[in-house]
Swiss-Prot record:
Gene name for this UniProt entry: chbP
Record EC number: 2.4.1.280
Species of provenance: Vibrio proteolyticus
Keywords associated with the record: Carbohydrate metabolism, Glycosyltransferase, Transferase
Temperature note: Optimum temperature is 30 degrees Celsius.
Entry protein name: N,N'-diacetylchitobiose phosphorylase
Catalytic activity: N,N'-diacetylchitobiose + phosphate = N-acetyl-alpha-D-glucosamine 1-phosphate + N-acetyl-D-glucosamine
GO biological process: carbohydrate metabolic process
Function: Catalyzes the reversible phosphorolysis of chitobiose (N,N'-diacetylchitobiose or (GlcNAc)(2)) into N-acetyl-alpha-D-glucosamine 1-phosphate (GlcNAc-1-P) and N-acetyl-D-glucosamine (GlcNAc) with inversion of the anomeric configuration. In the synthetic reaction, is also active on glucose-1-phosphate with 10% activity as compared with that on GlcNAc-1-P. GlcNAc is the best acceptor substrate, but the enzyme can use aryl-beta-glycosides of GlcNAc as the acceptor substrate with 10-20% activities of GlcNAc. Shows no phosphorolytic activity on cellobiose.
Length: 801
């Protein structure tokens, strides 16, 4: 069953049936103000932090997709009313027609009902801390119509804990007031004129308004049947205390064929509502702001465009996967309909991996995130697993947060720095390839010399920070020489404690290879020798202790008692995705062992929906292995199709030269390919999800937790750099694809260091891998394509064979 389709010309997903089996969401905002919005206009807004600066309320996991950012319409002649989005009024789909278009940082809602055509476009203008609701109402009947429009948002008390729990204070610490054309919401305890005020404004002069939620909705009612809309007029309520909303009402008389256009503006900051209300009364300014959002993403998407025989790959890579990856870089794991805003801060490993995918499209944000992570590293070399970057930003050290009487105090400086017992063994290592990729993309080699403080005092160059990360992993090894698992590795539920993690040793080896290449480029011969020797020791330990001869794969690790995890002798958790894919991705495994390991992955872990994380799933609790054994079978880390490491398998297969297998794995996970089986998938077909129920669960194939997952960044990185094979380097651009053998070729347009490269890949011999020749602007070249002049257009032809 399908509910919509991809409109690639407009980079939109079009939902033709609003009764999808779950909220399908989108992200509005590219800077500080963000709205998470569903296809039915449910969702919430926040400024910078959904934990501390929530603008509108959200009730997570509610039976219905409520509340939201709604516009109600009422036929004042008949008393009939509906909403432009299907919810919350939910008119019969036999009587009303709805269409929703999720675009890149905007969403469009359209409704045709009883001779009235209505559209609502939601977006956050660049440079503003506000959300625009651009509304058009048209009379398509042959009669004069009198139509009233009502807005509705429910304001939040700002801090999630107070908003959701401490009502004995929050109900009495805020109030609404009416100003000409707007409802102003005052967080009275907060003396800051910016963060202490929210508003909802309109470009029209309202006929009535409500600032009190319960006056607008009425007693024993909800958003589906608000009293004010039913009666055709708000009660002009505004006062201190209790629950607050923003509803502005206006009646319009429309001749046949006539349309009216106006806007609502939801935002933050005292006085900003008046300013933006006046500004957007000129609809040309609305059009210009929307055009700027379109241009923002046109510019980013243009950095890498592909035309291949695989339409699903083209659709996702040319827009949606980059969009999701950058959403994760900007908003981390802050806010979705699953992560509902109670955790402000950066997950160390999450952010380091997210950032590797977008240095070409957003180098400024990539650099910022890398600096954030380096400031969150301690002198010993490990990273703080979860931290607020503001803690260590020298420009924000003296900025005291507004103190609410209803919140838990912020942690002391000592509490911000955790010790070894709370350290995840993989966090810091992801930094190495990400920093290298950033410099390869931008050419900013001086970045390695920039001095950046450690979280626990002192400072060092970026290059020395990288060495500290590598040295930490070399020091914290077990008796076999394999890296200790510490609190956990990438798999948070694999709590090895004093045990050892094969995944981290493979990751350590990959980071070492990247660093050795960097040291060679910088001419640091002593470091080349030191870390080459370190890498050799890692390889020897891994090949000696981690290969399972009977199974023909790499084990997952060892418990603190020395018992192996992931052997052919075991009944549960025999084969694991992370260890086998990273053994190959890192370059540690030989061709022979790599092929055996990935054959085992294909045999034991593959499904039509992607690769399982492990199999068979654990059914018996074993605390030596960790919490993973106490997760339901086929769910999350225990035998689900955990999406994030799936792209590691795509990369691994390209390293082995097996393009057909790489594409088989890619196609299985690609949400585009599940667009017509939504009754199985449930989640959005334009977004990767955290996990898909595994074969040991009754809902096998159901996708869970869309948007905020490192899968998107890794999917983009794996396809662009390894399957399509277009990689930036310190000295040039390389093109070395690994594609399905039946592809005749493909085209890529790639912008790199200010020049554009139009790359034509030809595959006359139908091979998967192997470059026979490269020409640059008609001249044969060997190896990498050197940087060309800024602003130049260059023709590259690559022949495989």
């Amino acid at each position: 069953m399908k509910y919509g389709y991809f409109d690639n010309d407009n980079r939109e997903y079009v939902i033709t049936r609003p009764d999808v089996p779950a909220p399908w969401t989108n992200y509005l905002g590219t800077e500080k103000f963000c709205t998470v919005i569903s296809h039915n206009a449910g969702g919430y807004s926040f400024y910078n932090s959904p934990e501390y600066n929530r603008v509108t309320k959200f009730r997570p996991n509610a039976t219905f997709d409520r509340p939201g950012h709604y516009v109600y319409l009422r036929d004042d002649d008949s008393g009939d009313y509906w909403s432009i989005s299907w919810q919350p009024v939910a008119k019969s789909l036999d009587e009303a027609q709805y269409q929703i278009r999720h675009g890149l940082s905007y969403s469009k809602f359209q409704c045709d009902y009883n001779g009235i055509h209505a559209r609502k476009t939601l977006f956050v203008p660049k440079g503003e801390d506000a959300e625009i609701w651009d509304v058009v109402i048209k009379n398509t009947s042959d009669q004069v119509r009198t139509i009233s429009a009502f807005s509705f948002v429910e304001f939040s008390f700002s801090h999630i804990q107070s908003d959701n729990q401490n009502h004995q204070m929050s109900l009495y610490s805020a109030g609404t007031a009416y100003r000409p054309g707007l409802i102003e919401y005052d967080l009275y305890y907060n003396t800051d004129d910016f963060e202490g005020f929210y508003y909802l404004a309109s470009t029209f002069d309202p006929d009535s308004y409500d600032g009190q939620r319960d006056r607008f909705l009425g007693l024993y009612r909800d958003e589906a049947n608000p009293l004010a809309v039913e009666q055709g007029r708000c009660s002009n309520s505004a006062q201190t205390c209790y629950n607050h909303c923003g509803s502005l009402h206006k009646q319009f008389t429309l001749q046949p064929g006539e349309e009216i256009r106006f806007a609502y503006i939801l935002g933050i900051g005292k006085g900003n509502g008046e300013r933006l209300r006046e500004h957007y009364q000129d609809v040309a300014n609305i059009d210009a702001a929307f055009a700027a959002i379109k241009a923002h993403w046109d510019e980013r998407c243009a950095k890498f465009q592909v035309k291949s025989p695989n339409q699903g790959l083209d659709t996702m890579i040319n827009a949606w996967t980059l969009y999701q990856a950058e959403t994760c870089v900007v908003w981390s794991r802050f806010a979705s309909f699953i992560e509902v805003g109670g955790r402000t801060g950066l997950g160390y490993r999450d952010t380091a991996q997210d950032a590797i995918s977008v240095p070409h499209a957003n180098p400024e944000m990539t650099r910022k995130r890398i600096v954030d992570l380096l400031r969150g590293q301690v002198k010993a070399g490990y990273g703080l697993h979860l931290f607020d970057p503001d803690w260590f930003d020298p420009e924000k050290e003296d900025v005291a947060p507004s103190k609410s009487p209803t919140v838990v105090p912020t942690p002391s400086d000592e509490d911000k720095i955790h010790g070894i017992k709370d350290t995840c063994s993989d966090d810091h290592l992801w930094l190495i390839p990400t920093i290298c990729k950033y410099v390869m993309e931008t050419g900013e080699t001086s970045f390695f010399d920039q001095m950046i403080p450690y979280a626990d005092g002192g400072e060092a160059s970026v290059y020395e920070h990288m060495k500290a990360a590598l040295d930490f992993s070399a020091e914290y090894v077990g008796q076999t020489g394999i890296c200790k698992g510490l609190r956990a590795d990438w798999n948070d539920c694999l709590n090895l404690g004093g045990g050892e993690s094969s995944m981290v040793s493979f990751l350590h080896f990959w980071a070492l290879q990247e660093f050795i290449d960097l040291a060679k480029f910088l001419g640091k011969d002593q470091d080349v020798n030191t870390y080459t020797e370190m890498a050799a020791n890692v390889r020897e330990a891994c090949e000696t202790h981690l290969w399972d001869d009977e199974g023909g794969w790499y084990i997952r690790g060892l418990t603190k008692n020395g018992d192996k995890i992931g052997t052919a002798q075991q009944q549960e958790g025999r084969v694991h995705l992370e260890s086998n894919t990273l053994a190959v991705l890192s370059g540690l495994a030989s061709q022979e062992r790599g092929e055996q390991a990935m054959d085992a992955v294909d045999e034991h872990l593959f499904s039509p929906y992607g690769l399982h994380l492990n199999a068979p799933s654990f059914s018996t609790p074993n605390d030596d292995i960790g919490f993973v054994t106490r997760v339901y079978q086929g769910v999350k880390e225990n035998g689900a199709i955990f999406s994030h490491p799936n792209p590691w398998a795509w990369v691994a297969e390209t390293k082995l030269g097996r393009g057909d297998r790489a594409m088989k794995f890619y196609d299985a996970l690609n949400p585009y390919n599940q667009n017509d089986i939504i009754e199985k998938r449930i989640a959005e077909p334009y977004s990767y999800v955290q996990f898909i129920m595994g074969r040991d669960h009754q809902d096998h194939g159901r996708a869970n937790h869309p948007w905020l997952t490192g899968t998107s960044g890794w999917a983009y990185f794996a396809v662009t750099n390894y399957i399509l094979g277009v990689q930036s380097g310190f000295t040039g651009l390389s093109v070395d694809p690994c594609i399905p053998s039946d592809w005749p070729g493909f085209e890529v347009t790639r912008q790199w260091r200010g020049a554009t490269y139009h790359i034509q890949v030809e595959n006359p011999d139908h091979v998967s891998k192997g470059v026979k020749s490269i020409t640059l602007n008609g001249a044969p070249i060997q190896g990498r394509i050197p940087p060309q002049a800024q602003g130049s257009d260059n023709q590259v032809v690559v022949v495989l064979g």
